[in-house]
Structures are given as structure tokens and as C-alpha cells.
């Protein structure tokens, strides 16, 4: 039996139905908490083929996957477009870099605690993978060691901008 490899933080894994238009706490399903590499690989085996069809969130335990969470409000999301054929591998490699704390480049690694999580959002022929960031200090593509197979530009959007846009749309 292998020795358990503990993560430096506990990470929570959520699912949100892509067809559910409600974005309330109740509309998210918390699947589990992960505290070891072995737990991550067990979960990965279960969801691997589903990752391109659902909205999944891997977040630090104390961070809820919504823009207006106290840990997300002043930060934003870095969005990466990944073609459907590459989503499973990209998601897996990105998760490994997040959980292993190797996502940030050398210049920015001291800001590691500002990485709140990652998520996936399915579209027709691709998925949008988002990095959830606590601060706008990590808004540049150069901050991250990203897997190479993504499509198009890496785009940052502040969560406050998303909150404001959503508020205008609903009023």
C-alpha cells in the first residue's frame, strides 16, 4: 500500500448543472473534499469522461464558487478555451498543477495563496476552463504555467465586472 500524499490545503469539489439558470448556494452540489493526492485520483477516475459535459469546480475549502464570495469579490477569473478533445487532459494537468502548487511561474509563486480554484464550463465544441483568483495581481497569462493545448487567447475578467453585469441584466 502506498503512503498517503497529503495536499497543503483541503479542496472542495462541486458540480453545477449547466442547464440550471439559478446561481444560488442551493444550486451547487458539493461532491467531496480532497485532502490527498489519492483522493484526487479516485475522483478523477470517476468523473474523467463527464468533465466536458458538466460544470465542475475545484475550490479551496473555504471558498465558495461564486463571484461574490468574500474570497473572490476583488479578484477575477482567467478564462481558457479548450477544445472538447483536449478537455480531459487539460483539466487533469491543470488540477495537478493547482493541487501540487506548481501553477504559478517562478516570478509569481509567492502569490500562491491567491489561487482560489478552477472550474469548467461546457460549450458546444469546447469548454471554458477558469482559474479563480483572489487578487487582480494574477491577471496576466505570464503568471501561470498552463498546459500548452488551449485554443485562442487567455482572458482575464474581474469578478466585480461580472457582478455588475449580472446585476444590470437582472434589473
Annotate each language-model stretch with its function.
Residues 28-33:
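A short, exposed loop/beta-hairpin motif centered on an aromatic-Gly-Thr core
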Residues 1-4, 35, 42:
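RNA-binding basic/glycine-rich loop and surface signature characteristic of RAMP-family CRISPR effectors
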Residues 1-10, 26, 47-49, 53-171:
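Conserved NAD+-utilizing ADP-ribose enzyme module
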